[in-house]
């Protein structure tokens, strides 16, 4: 469907029309979700070039495309390519939209996750702490994005061996998600697995066994919904 839409928009509107660029972004997103990363990256790179040329490097749609390309690079393990794009996007978003704009908070979270993937834990923790503080202040302590930020900070603490701090945050997040989302919501299950992994890392095996479901380790999360409309998919 996305391929047909892009073909039609390109034929009818031309390759540089905003609707064509939006269709190309959506096809790239679908490729990324399907694990077809090389195809996704090629489309995102083309879109970034076109949007930069047509809209300018600081237009919100250009920032979204740069963020999306960085995410595809990250998924492909190309952290050296992803991190500079995330850094540039955060800088531009902060300057254009403001420090506390939701898209700026998303950009900061994404950069923190990339730093964490690259083993730059001090940098990741600094950004995660700032993002959690801002989300708590702006959205409240129980907003889903705040809970995601708390989960991600706990994950970074855990990677850094700061297990007591990680466990405290994981316990708080699990309690809040169970109360707000219900015990069987996917994010609640993620929190339960992450807390179990932290317990196990701390040698608290009995506590872990009470919670544990198979998991490859503490999972970080994208800010907001799985595919935040403001960051990934154009309408």
Kindly label every feature range from the protein language model.
Residues 1-235:
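Intrinsic-disorder-linked linear interaction elements in eukaryotic regulatory proteins
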């Amino acid at each position: 469907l996305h391929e047909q839409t892009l073909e039609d928009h390109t034929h009818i509107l031309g390759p540089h029309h905003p609707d064509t660029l939006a269709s190309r972004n959506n096809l790239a997103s679908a490729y990324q979700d399907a694990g077809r990363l090389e195809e996704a990256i090629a489309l995102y790179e083309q879109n970034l070039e076109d949007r930069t040329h047509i809209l300018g490097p600081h237009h919100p749609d250009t920032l979204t495309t740069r963020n999306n390309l960085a995410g595809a690079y990250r998924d492909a393990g190309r952290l050296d390519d992803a991190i500079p794009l995330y850094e540039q996007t955060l800088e531009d978003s902060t300057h254009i939209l403001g420090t506390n704009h939701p898209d700026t908070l998303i950009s900061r979270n994404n950069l923190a996750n990339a730093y964490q993937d690259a083993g730059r834990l001090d940098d990741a923790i600094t950004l995660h702490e700032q993002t959690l503080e801002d989300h708590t202040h702006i959205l409240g302590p129980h907003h889903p994005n705040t809970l995601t930020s708390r989960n991600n900070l706990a994950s970074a603490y855990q990677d850094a061996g700061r297990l007591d701090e990680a466990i405290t945050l994981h316990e708080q997040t699990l309690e809040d998600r169970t109360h707000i989302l219900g015990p069987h919501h996917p994010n609640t299950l993620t929190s339960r697995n992450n807390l179990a992994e932290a317990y196990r890392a701390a040698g608290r095996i009995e506590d872990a066994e009470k919670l544990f479901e198979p998991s490859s380790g503490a999972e970080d999360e994208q800010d907001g919904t799985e595919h935040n409309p403001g960051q990934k998919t154009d309408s």
